[in-house]
Regions:
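C-terminal capping alpha-helices of c-type cytochrome domains
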Residues: 84-107, 163-199
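The canonical Cys-X-X-Cys-His
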Residues: 47-54, 94, 128-139, 173
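Sec/Tat signal peptide C-region and signal peptidase I cleavage site
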Residues: 20-26
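Short microdomains enriched in Cys/His and/or Lys/Arg
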Residues: 72-76, 152-166
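Positively charged n-region of N-terminal signal peptides that target proteins for export
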Residues: 1-5
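Electrostatic cytochrome c docking/interface patches
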Residues: 27-47, 55-61, 78-84, 90, ...
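Short cysteine/histidine-rich zinc-coordinating motifs and their immediately flanking basic loops
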Residues: 62, 144-150
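Bacterial N-terminal signal peptides
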Residues: 9-19
């Protein structure tokens, strides 16, 4: 009976999380900097570095696997200093994001005047902050080191199945967490530590 109540409460929290999480995220943006940037942010930063159109357009119009994107980014790092500055994990995160979202359905005509933080699709970090705080704080998620299969298993449990995410979003979220979760608790601000909470 208690388990049913717990699941029901979690389900209700999931339903209302879309309304509650965004203000929370806005209020704690500085505190959440310990969570690694997702592909949307990394790609936005590359665009902000003002690469030539010849270098930028292939990033927005190509269709490749994560491995192919990773090789492409390495091959273009000399021409794209913003890519060269990324560490291995960030490059892998960006390649993963590109594999999910490129090519864009439509490339803006005026790329220089486009607000890319709004134009680009959400990344795994965005999805975690938008959807993973209905029943617990985000720290419960990002401090765990798990396989993709394990993450997808959790996302399919009754308490998580009610969260409004597409299968593709769930897959992308799991992939982001494989690359970026497992953050040591010492790197988490004390006010956001989960006191040992887990799934």
């Amino acid at each position: 009976m208690m388990r049913f109540i717990s699941l029901a409460g979690c389900a209700l929290a999931g339903i209302f999380s879309a309304c509650l999480v965004q203000p929370l995220a806005a209020q704690t943006a500085e505190q959440l900097t310990f969570i690694p940037a997702g592909g949307r942010t990394l790609l936005s930063n590359i665009v902000a570095s003002k690469p030539s159109a010849d270098e930028l357009k292939p990033l927005l119009t190509g269709k490749h696997s994560r491995e192919e994107w990773s090789a492409y980014l390495k091959s273009r790092s000399q021409a794209l200093p913003a890519v060269q500055r990324l560490n291995d994990k960030e490059q892998a995160t960006l390649a993963d994001y590109l594999s999910y979202h490129m090519p864009l359905p439509q490339v803006p005509a005026n790329m220089a005047r486009t607000d890319w933080t709004r134009t680009l699709p959400k990344d795994g970090r965005d999805l975690s902050l938008d959807n993973c705080q209905g029943c617990h704080i985000i720290t419960v998620v990002v401090t765990q080191e798990r396989t993709k299969k394990a993450w997808l298993g959790t996302l399919s449990t009754p308490s998580h199945a009610v969260i409004k995410m597409t299968p593709a979003e769930r897959d992308e979220l799991a992939s982001y967490l494989v690359l970026n979760a497992g953050i040591p608790i010492e790197q988490v601000p004390e006010e956001l530590r989960a006191s040992g909470a887990t799934y």
